[in-house]
Swiss-Prot record:
The gene is Tm9sf4. Belongs to the nonaspanin (TM9SF) (TC 9.A.2) family. This is Transmembrane 9 superfamily member 4. One of its GO terms (cellular component) is Golgi apparatus. It is found in: Membrane; Golgi apparatus; Early endosome. The lineage of its organism: Eukaryota, Metazoa, Chordata, Craniata, Vertebrata. InterPro entries: EMP70. Pfam families: EMP70 (PF02990). Residues 304-347, 399-417, 472-502, 558-571, 621-643 are cytoplasmic. The keyword Phosphoprotein applies. Associates with proteins harboring glycine-rich transmembrane domains and ensures their efficient localization to the cell surface. It is a multi-pass membrane protein.
Length: 643
């Protein structure tokens, strides 16, 4: 015990040092060196809104188009995220300034938006859509300068806090009028690479910013060869979009280059440090202290109580008194009695093992920086393939447990393991995808991708689950330390606090308390289009979650056995996943207080994906708690003498 107390602080220190470099990453692509006046291609990714949760491709709106539209070949993760990367008509040359340039200019005539196009643009603006562009694979960001008073200074000067917003707003509304950002001022930062004297200088793009502006048609002066002149100062009025009639306007842009000391390897730091790290650190450390303090108290109570019980029980002259005062030893002949529906239980636990292995590897690899943010969709692609290949471990654990529970139909059990949880996920996603298709969103998974996912499921995951299940079922079952009686013991009437739902509420508080702060950042990344790359923090929280779920599960099964209720298999699995109930409650709170979603389909998408998240989290935490409790039960009954 003393050795463990010495080891834990060292382990936490190591994890904290790992979290210190939580924004470290290994660049996923090789740097591109540009020479003077080399073209720097600007591509469009998609349009997003936190109000609708429906991404659209760039040319779903009447933007200016190049002569030939070319879409980038995308990986699985990009397709599932709704990315549709396409070229744009912006002409940008390395370290070459442009004061004002008109897009899709035909004989200096403005673009005319039809009534239908005007209504669509106005609708997207009122839905607060953002436009996402990339240059040299670097996403565009809008600089936000926030001012806060400095209390330490006597004159209380305002300090400027610079933050960045992903993408730029399509437009804005003011006094029931709708305005479009039709002029983009691009600011690109480059880093000059050190070269030998006889070689030409090369440049690398290290930041991509934009200042969106709305400029009325009458205030723009156009010249020859697509040039234009911007109005000076605040003399211009914004470009209004009237959804009830045709609108004429220009799409214009300007390019400004600035040299930067930021090196290419650190160019993503601007995007990955947008959250308040101090609050994040404080919350994480607070969770660590509280969780380990409470877990330590619970562990000490259980260990001391068990040591006393086992010592008394092993005294031959005191057996009768001990049997009367201690309940968990009275059910030794029934504690390993197989539960109802062992096939379903083992199948769910097998899927939980799949999830656990997948999540552990993904977080660990991302923490090491191997899933670079420049490799778009790499995280989701890796997670999908890992879940498929982890089927062999899920099948093995499910097969061995099923045999331990006296199961005989291993082929049916393997099929259940391979299809139960993935089938529910696929079914919900397919229904949601139909609604997304109906809205013509780029977030809809294309039919070929759907077929590819089915092929991965039945061509990779299912055979691997069968393979693992076969070897797991053939392996020697878990050795239970006591024999099971032929006649089941009568279970006494249970007190109210031993109710299953009460147990779920009690057991879920501690694991949820360990992760609810991190859950806020994850929800912000998913539903508000923010970057999330604090995988060092996430790995630490995951370890705390595993420890807290295990210890709470042990405490709950101990109290249940003390109440002479040996039906712990299903109950422990459900109770250990109790934190999923609090995740659901938090998701509802987040929906009501943080998001401005009012339409039916966005609400359906939110709660549909939330259902999948809660189900997966329940499987994960339930599996962790179940195996911890199973090891605990086998350990304590192996420590007592049974005649």
């Amino acid at each position: 015990m003393a050795a463990a107390m010495i080891w834990w602080p060292r382990f936490l220190l190591l994890l904290c040092l790992t979290c210190k470099g939580s924004t470290f990453y290994v660049p996923g692509v090789a740097p591109i060196n540009f020479h003077q006046n080399d073209p720097v291609e600007i591509k469009a990714v998609k349009l997003t809104s936190s109000r609708t949760q429906l991404p659209y491709e760039y040319y779903s709106l009447p933007f200016c188009q190049p002569i030939k539209i070319t879409y980038k070949a995308e990986n699985l993760g990009e397709v599932l995220r709704g990315d549709r990367i396409v070229n744009t008509p912006f002409q940008v040359l390395m370290n070459s300034e442009k004061k004002c340039e008109v897009l899709c200019n035909q004989s200096n005539k403005p673009i005319t938006l039809t009534v239908e196009q005007s209504r669509l643009v106005a609708e997207r603006i009122t839905e607060e859509y953002y436009v996402h562009l990339i240059a040299d694979n670097l996403p565009v960001a809008t600089r936000l300068e926030l001012y806060s008073s400095n209390r330490d200074s006597d004159d209380k000067k305002k300090e400027k806090d610079v933050q960045f917003e992903h993408g730029y707003r399509l437009g804005f509304t003011d006094v029931n009028k709708i305005y479009l950002h039709n002029h983009l001022s691009f600011i690109l930062y480059y880093h000059r690479e050190d070269m030998e004297e006889d070689q030409e200088h090369t440049y690398r793009v290290v930041r991509f910013e934009v200042i969106p502006q709305s400029i009325r048609l009458e205030d723009l002066k156009t010249g020859e060869k697509s040039s234009c002149t911007l109005p000076e100062g605040a003399n211009s009025l914004p470009q209004e979009i009237d959804p009830t009639k045709e609108n004429q306007l220009y799409f214009t842009y300007s390019v400004h280059w600035e040299e930067s000391d930021i090196k290419w390897a650190s160019r993503w730091d601007t995007y990955l440090t947008m959250s308040d790290v101090q609050i994040h650190w404080f919350s994480i450390i607070n969770s660590v202290v509280v969780v380990f303090f409470l877990s330590g108290i619970l562990s000490m109570i259980i260990i001391r109580t068990l040591r006393k019980d086992i010592a008394n029980y092993n005294k031959e002259d005191d057996i009768e008194d001990t049997m009367e005062e201690s309940g968990w030893k009275l059910v030794h002949g029934d504690v390993f009695r197989p539960p109802q529906y062992p096939m379903i239980l083992s199948s769910l636990l097998g899927s939980g093992i799949q999830l656990f292995c997948m999540i552990l590897i993904v977080i660990f690899v991302a923490m090491l920086g191997m899933l670079s943010p420049s490799s778009r969709g790499a995280l989701m692609t890796t997670a999908c393939f890992l879940f498929m290949f982890m089927g062999v471990f899920g099948g093995f654990s499910a097969g061995r447990l099923y045999r331990t529970l006296k199961g005989h139909r291993w082929k049916k059990g393997a099929f259940c393991t391979a299809t139960l949880y993935p089938g529910v996920v696929f079914g919900i996603c397919f229904v949601l995808n139909c609604f997304i298709w109906g809205k013509h969103s780029s977030g809809a998974v294309p039919f070929p991708t759907m077929v590819a996912l089915l092929c991965m499921w039945f061509g990779i995951s299912l055979p691997l689950v069968y393979l693992g299940y076969y070897f797991g079922f053939r392996k020697q079952p878990y050795d239970n330390p006591v024999r099971t009686n032929q006649i089941p013991r009568q279970i006494p009437e249970q007190r109210w606090y031993m109710n299953r739902f009460v147990g779920i509420l009690m057991a879920g508080i501690l694991p949820f308390g360990a992760m609810f702060i991190e859950l806020f950042f994850i929800f912000s990344a998913i539903w508000e289009n923010q970057f999330y790359y604090l995988f060092g923090f996430l790995f630490l929280v995951f370890i705390i979650l595993v420890v807290s779920c295990s210890q709470i599960s042990i405490v709950m099964v101990y109290f249940q056995l003390c109440a002479e209720d040996y039906r712990w298999w299903w109950r422990n699995f459900l109770v250990s996943g109790g934190s999923a109930f609090y995740v659901l409650v938090y998701a509802i709170f987040y929906f009501v207080n943080k998001l401005d979603i009012v339409e039916f389909i966005p609400s359906l998408l939110y709660f549909g994906y939330t259902t999948l998240m809660v189900l997966s989290f329940w499987l994960l935490t339930g599996t962790i708690g179940f195996y911890a409790a199973y090891m605990f039960v086998r350990k304590i009954y192996a420590a007592v003498k049974i005649d």
